[in-house]
Structures are given as structure tokens and as C-alpha cells.
Amino acid sequence: MTYDILVSGCIALKGAQALALQHKDELVRRYGEAYIDKAIERRDPEIGIPADKGIRLIRQIAEGGINAALWQSAKELGCGLRVSLYDIPVYQDTIEICNTLDADPYTMDSDGQYIIYAENGLSTVEELKAAGFKDAALIGHTTQDKKRLIIYGEVERFLTPPERVQA
């Protein structure tokens, strides 16, 4: 059986906040204090994932970021995956902080967010949004083969095993 792959919200928030605190002066000079303060003060919703009989697996996105969570969960399920990079939600300020500091948001701590494998991804996304996870998104699906692919546009690349974790 194949499953849809969802994310409960924007990734890399915790890691980007840690970087912003460490490099606040540099970032404020580039983006302004109000912009960086907003990025630092943003919080994930502190609510539970709704119970759904069609959910196969839920994994927190922590050390190693979404890439590590995808790798580990595919290994646990014994499946491959196809994930659209463009469908993974990331706040714009997180991208800018990461670009400025040469960090990768896809390998960054996203504590508070979850990867969810569900039979009916669209229905589960709607349940998540109704429960307060406004940025929940369907990002891909599992495959019968063992290939773990990240797709962006016409380009496909293999997901690599997690190495040393970042932020």
C-alpha cells in the first residue's frame, strides 16, 4: 500500500530562530530589527495531531530536519518516496536567514512539526488545518521501490542518509 506524505507546518523554525539569536546583529543590519524579531518570536501551535484511522506513521521533525525525518521514516516503513521540494512549507524569513548564514533549512531542527504518512492525505491536511496547523501540506507519497527521491521542477535527486545534524 502507498501512503501520502504530509508535513504539519513550516519546517526549520526552531533552527532558524537559534541562528537568528546567534547572529542577530548581522541579520538586523541586512533585514531590519522588526523583521528578525518577528522570525525569532514566531511559535508553532501547541496542539495535538488529530487522531485519524488512516494515519500509518507520525514522526517529529527534530535533529537532522525534514531530510532526516523522511529518510528514517522511509527506512522504518520499508518503502521509497517521492517528495516535492516546492510543496514543503518554509517561512520566507527562515529561507532568508538560512541563505544569509549558509545554512540548509531542510537539515535544520524543526521541533514541533511532524511528518505524517496517511492513506488520504488531502483529508488529513484538512483535519490538521481545522485543528490549527494552518500551514499543513501534502508534500509527496510513498512508493513500492526503495528510491527516496526529492523532486524540484524537472529535477529529481536522491535523498541522502542523514549525516551530522545542523542547528
Predicted segments with their positions:
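Acidic, Ser/Thr/Pro-rich beta/coil linker or hinge segments at domain junctions
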Residues: 130-167
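Active-site-proximal betaalpha loop/short-helix elements
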Residues: 35-110
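Short, solvent-exposed amphipathic alpha-helical segments in soluble enzyme
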Residues: 21-25, 71-78, 98-101, 126-135
